[in-house]
Amino acid sequence: MSTAVQVDDVMRYRDSRFQTIAAKLLPTQYLVVDDDTALTTTLGSCVAACLRDPVLKIGGMNHFLLPEGQVGDGAPTRYGSYAMELLINDMLKRGAHRKRIEAKVFGGANVLKGFTSNPVGTRNAEFVRQYLQAEHIPIIAEDLCGIHPRKVWFFATTGRVVVQRLPHAHEAEVAATESAVRARLSKAPVTGGVELFE
């Protein structure tokens, strides 16, 4: 089974809905797989990018909290720019070809109260679209913005994605989880680097 190249371990469990092993990604995590593992996450204002090389049938998902940060900010994996580089580079290391990579992107809901003039969900959605366009990675499917949290399942070998929009009752729970992660990461020390592949 494929493993995450990150300090945090990705939780795996048996998903009864799809009768397969699932890997649940939390904010700041990513995972690349080349098997039938379902990559899953729950999103509020965060965004998940699902990338895939359809020839190799390899793919991965990330889950980021904010588009970009300042130099010296803690926990760089919370930022989309860093999370996207990690995901793309891991796929390239495993043999994916940049010109074949395609994307499906999800999340960016405006569920956090008090962020009305420039909501973080909208900024995350704009970031992922602009980033992928700059990298010449086509977005072949998206479900971004709006007001509902989402649960996403991504099957890398087939490219199938299932999105379940969660009822408003889950908004407070998802928003509280994202806010708690943001607070914890703002105090985290800066570590690691990114190796870029062309």
UniProtKB/Swiss-Prot annotation:
Disulphide-bridged cysteine pairs: none
**Catalytic reactions on record:** L-glutaminyl-[protein] + H2O = L-glutamyl-[protein] + NH4(+)
Query: CDD domains, per this entry?
Result: CheD
What does the UniProt keyword field contain? Answer: Chemotaxis, Hydrolase
Query: What biological-process terms (Gene Ontology) are attached?
Result: chemotaxis
What the entry lists under InterPro entries is as follows:
CheD-like_sf (IPR038592), Chemorcpt_Glu_NH3ase_CheD (IPR005659), Cytotoxic_necrot_fac-like_cat (IPR011324)
Q: What is its EC number?
A: 3.5.1.44
* A Gene Ontology molecular function term of the record: protein-glutamine glutaminase activity
Q: Note whether Hydrolase occurs among the keywords.
A: yes
- To which protein family does this belong? Belongs to the CheD family.
Q: What does this protein do?
A: Probably deamidates glutamine residues to glutamate on methyl-accepting chemotaxis receptors (MCPs), playing an important role in chemotaxis.
Q: What protein am I looking at?
A: Probable chemoreceptor glutamine deamidase CheD
Q: Native species of this protein?
A: Xanthomonas axonopodis pv. citri (strain 306)
Q: Which gene encodes it?
A: cheD
